[in-house]
């Protein structure tokens, strides 16, 4: 049985962010999807998870946060 590359504790990852400030761990061997950009890495899965935990503190999409400020 093969390991899911997104769950590989020994893999190398990037942290990606989209225009809504949503974060994703992404294996370095995979193409970066349209609409996403690298903000951290190449690093271990643990280091990337640490980055996400420290930097993605508000899970609401950016458009929702912006709309709530305008009201």
From Swiss-Prot:
Cellular component (GO) terms are: cytosol
Report the InterPro entries cross-referenced here. MbtH-like_dom, MbtH-like_sf, MLP_fam
- Superkingdom of origin: Bacteria
Query: Coiled coil where?
Result: none
Q: Which GO terms describe its biological process?
A: siderophore biosynthetic process
Q: What does this protein do?
A: Could be involved in mycobactin synthesis.
State the name under which the record lists this protein. Protein MbtH
